[in-house]
Amino acid sequence: MGQKVNPVGLRLGINRNWTSRWFPSTRTAPSNIDEDNKIRKFLKKELYYAGVSEIVIERAAKKLRVTVVAARPGLIIGKKGVDIEKVKEGLKTLIKKEVSINIKEVKRPQADAQLAAENVATQLEKRVAFRRAMKKVMQAALKSGAKGIKVRVSGRLAGAEIARTEWYMEGRVPLHTLRAKIDYGFAEAMTVYGIIGVKVWIFKGEVLQKGIQFEKKEEAKEEREPRRSRRGRQ
């Protein structure tokens, strides 16, 4: 099951939160979903240069608040906030509502699955060899503190006549473990041979009661090793 479904959707309410946060009625739900989709498409298109990882939309009464999580927030805000005001005006024209926009920075861009997927897609569009692009992103993620990463590309790789799928994995990516914090990203590369899909899974540790715990399994391993050695002496 964990291998097939979206890992973010599988963990909603466990260790992941919704990116659209509002309470719908039967009458307003369709229009709100359509509006959220328009907002995300608009921001992805307008802020492509800033490395947008996630867009969170919150509604309360007649207020609409959008939080953009990006790798380069300074490019979105601009000098004296000029650029962010242009984005606000564009959104206001699109949905005919007042919108407040918050900008958050991605703490570790190399360990963000969405940014990693877009990075691979960009390299494929520049005709970089797909294996080189995948391995480069994987090495950067592991250096940034990721516990494991899996990258999969599908399509006419290297201009092959028949589409195929190839993937690489480093470290652990426990997709069946619900307490595991798995980040997931998807992007598409528009090449001269067609569209190549890129999927990235990044394992960042296990979420327990006290938050993400990285070292617990390593400590348990160190405790078990002396027991084995004692049995070996017997």
From Swiss-Prot:
Keywords: Ribonucleoprotein, Ribosomal protein, RNA-binding, rRNA-binding. GO terms for molecular function: mRNA binding; rRNA binding; structural constituent of ribosome. The keyword Cell membrane does not apply. InterPro entries: KH_dom, KH_dom-like_a/b, KH_dom_type_2, KH_sf_prok-type, Ribosomal_S3_C_sf, Ribosomal_uS3_bac-typ, Ribosomal_uS3_C, Ribosomal_uS3_CS. The keyword Ribosomal protein applies. GO terms for biological process: translation. Part of the 30S ribosomal subunit. Forms a tight complex with proteins S10 and S14. This is Small ribosomal subunit protein uS3. The gene is rpsC.
